[in-house]
Amino acid sequence: MKLSKFIYLFLLVAVLVACDSGQSAQAGNSEAPRVRKTRVKKSVAKSTKVDEIIVDSTAQNSLPQGFVYVKNVIPDVIEELRYNTTNNFMGERADGYQANRAILTVEAANSLKSAADELRDKGYVIKIYDAYRPQSAVSHFVRWSLSADERNKADYYPTLSKRSLFGKYISRKSGHSRGSTIDMTICYKDSGKEVDMGGHFDFFGQASHTVFVGKYPLGEVTGEHRSMRLMLKDVMTRHGFKPIRNEWWHFTLRNEPHRNSYYNFPVK
C-alpha cells in the first residue's frame, strides 16, 4: 500500500513538471516571432520615412536662402545660359547645370532689375549668358584647361595656347559662385534680336576688352561697338555693379552679400 502511494505521488509530480515545461516552451516560441515582427516593422517604417524626406527635398526645387530666380524678378529677361549647352568654349555642358534658369542673390537681382528698367526705357532688354555658377562647374573648367581637348580653339582662343588660359581666364574659384556676378548683353526690346557688340561672349583675347577697337581673328570691333559696350557699362555702374576691363559682358555687384562664400548647389 505504501509502495503504491509512493508510485502514485511520483507519477503525479512527473506529469506536473512536464506540463509546466511544455507551457514555458510554447510561451517562448510565441514571444520570439512577435519581437522579430516588431523589429521588422520599425525598420521598414524608418526606411520609408527617410526616402520620403529625400523625395520631398528634391521635389521642392528650392534655392538656398537669399537666392532667387532672375525671371521672377525681371519677367522679360532673356535667359541663354551657355554652360547649360554645348555652345561654349569647352564644347560641352558644364557640371552643375541642369536647367536654363539664371540665379542671383536677392541683392544682385534687385539691382539688376533697376538696370533693366533703365535699359527698357532705352529700348533694350537684358540677356543673360551666366549668373550664379556652381563650384562644380568651375572645377570642370579647370579640368578642361589641363586636358588636350581643343575642339573650339578657333572660335574662342585662336591666338592663345590652351594652357595659358588657366590663371588668366580660368581659376579654381570664380566670383560667379558667390551669386552676385552676371555675364550679360542686351537685345532690342521690339525684336528680341541681340545687339551687335563686335565680339561674342567668352572670347579669350583683347577683342573682349570693353574699350578695344580694331581687327581680330574673328572680325572687327568698331567705334560703334565700343559705344554700345560703354553704354552698357555706364548703366550697370549706375545701378551698383562693377565691371572688369577685359570682359565687356561681366559685372559684379559692388556690395555683394557673400564675399567669402562659394556655393555649389546645382542650377535647376
Model-found features: residue ranges?
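Extracytoplasmic cell-surface/polysaccharide-interacting catalytic and binding patches
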Residues: 20-131, 139, 143-246, 255-268
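Conserved metal-phosphate-binding beta-hairpin within the catalytic cores
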Residues: 251
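Segments that shape or occlude catalytic/ligand-binding pockets
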Residues: 134
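Bacterial N-terminal signal peptides
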Residues: 8-17
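Bacterial N-terminal signal peptides that target proteins for export
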Residues: 1-7
